[in-house]
């Protein structure tokens, strides 16, 4: 078993690190403080291929593996976790559109989405349908050559500032089989957006409700076939869980580096606090948990690349483990800074705020446990 990276992976990771240090990290605190959505930086990321990492080359994407993408997102998140997380969502939505969409849909959207000139939102969650996503009530009713959309989506990243909504709506009966997926132009008449939500973290990306009132779209906006929407949405989420776990890894690495430096500089009782065994034990646990989370994420990404039968379970495991452990690493790094960790002069409080939501979105960590447990009860052959 070889855990080393290829020369290509090392090069991609280094490019991402340099971009993160130059284009994200110096501005992350400002974007957070002023709730600025850095579209220019995202376009710069697109110019490097970071907006189409695992989209097929035949459709204009980079054609990288999910493991490659995980390594890149990990580096981007060290510069600005919130912005990196949006880039992962854009990648997921763009992949869904290009992987399952028609030639006409790809011709309309693919090039601009992959370059970062236009941006995509993923629209699944509703006010009354969160963890129970298959119960969504937004409808898409066929009317001649069109579909007419009615309903509402909640907590949509980028909504109001993006160009296309990859949106799940009910075209048939109840349950998952009645859901279809659409590429909806964001400026369609009948679509309006709620206020930009005031959030604990992820302040560099807007989060709004999407309200659909007799929003009419052409039937050729349908992604895949009718009734396939839930399957398409879940296919996107397997990768999305790896992506968000990778963002947690990046934030935790940044927090650990900050803590490592601080405990060697900060003196109390006549010596650096890093000389105290309790601090050393804390750092040891942080590093151990971070490495364990890294390996879990990379295993799950590899399983997804191999289309292994237990890929969805492994993605759920990786998301649950990495987002929990990495939040703890960020929180411990803040604790090691004492009062300084709590003020915005240092980035620790931002790392904590930005990683907290990772335990909620792309499926709550409680739902991840449900997915894992279902598989465990069926078969333990994955061990």
What is the meaning of each model-derived region?
Residues 86, 128-131, 155-158, 170-173, ...:
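Short Gly/Pro-enriched turn/cap motifs at secondary-structure boundaries
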Residues 64-65, 132-134, 158-162, 176-178, ...:
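Short glycine/proline-enriched turns and hinge-like loops at secondary-structure junctions
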Residues 63-72, 132-136, 185, 211, ...:
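Structural signature of FAD isoalloxazine-binding scaffolds in flavoprotein oxidoreductases
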Residues 146, 150-193:
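A short core secondary-structure module
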Residues 211-233:
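A short, charged helix-loop
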Residues 135, 187-218:
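Flexible, small-/acidic-enriched active-site or ligand-binding loops
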Residues 1-84, 88, 100-105, 112, ...:
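Alpha-helical interface subdomain recognition
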Residues 116-124:
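A short, Trp-centered hydrophobic/proline-enriched beta-strand micro-motif
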């Amino acid at each position: 078993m070889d855990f080393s990276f290829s020369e290509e992976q090392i090069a991609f990771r280094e490019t991402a690190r340099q971009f993160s240090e130059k284009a994200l990290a110096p501005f992350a605190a400002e974007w957070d403080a002023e709730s600025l959505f850095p579209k220019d930086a995202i376009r710069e990321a697109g110019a490097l291929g970071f907006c189409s990492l695992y989209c097929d080359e035949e459709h204009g994407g980079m054609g990288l593996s999910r493991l490659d993408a995980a390594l890149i997102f990990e580096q981007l998140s060290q510069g600005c976790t919130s912005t990196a997380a949006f880039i992962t969502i854009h990648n997921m939505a763009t992949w869904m559109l290009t992987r399952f969409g028609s030639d006409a849909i790809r011709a309309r959207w693919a090039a601009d989405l992959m370059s970062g000139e236009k941006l995509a939102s993923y629209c699944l969650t509703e006010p009354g349908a969160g963890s129970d996503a298959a119960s969504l009530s937004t409808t898409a009713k066929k009317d001649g050559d069109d579909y007419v959309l009615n309903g509402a989506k909640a907590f949509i990243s980028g909504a109001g500032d993006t160009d296309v909504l990859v949106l799940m709506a009910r075209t048939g009966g109840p349950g998952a089989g009645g859901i279809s997926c659409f590429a909806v132009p964001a400026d369609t008449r009948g679509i309006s957006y709620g206020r930009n939500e005031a959030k604990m973290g992820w302040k560099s990306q807007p989060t709004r409700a999407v309200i659909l009132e007799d929003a009419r779209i052409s039937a050729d906006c349908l992604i895949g076939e009718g009734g396939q929407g839930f399957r398409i949405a879940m296919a996107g989420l397997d990768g999305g869980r790896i992506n968000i776990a990778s963002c947690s890894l990046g934030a935790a690495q940044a927090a650990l580096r900050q803590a490592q430096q601080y405990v060697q500089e900060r003196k109390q009782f006549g010596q650096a606090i890093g000389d105290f065994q309790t601090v050393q034990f804390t750092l040891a646990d942080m590093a151990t948990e971070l490495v364990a989370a890294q390996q879990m994420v990379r295993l799950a990404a590899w399983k997804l690349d191999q289309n292994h039968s237990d890929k969805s379970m492994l993605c759920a495991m990786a998301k649950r483990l990495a987002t929990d452990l990495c939040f703890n690493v960020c929180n411990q790094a803040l604790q090691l800074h004492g009062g300084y960790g709590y003020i915005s002069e240092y980035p620790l409080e931002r790392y904590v705020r930005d990683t907290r939501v990772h335990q909620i979105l792309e499926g709550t960590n409680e739902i991840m446990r449900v997915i894992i447990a279902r598989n465990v009860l069926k078969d333990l052959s994955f061990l």
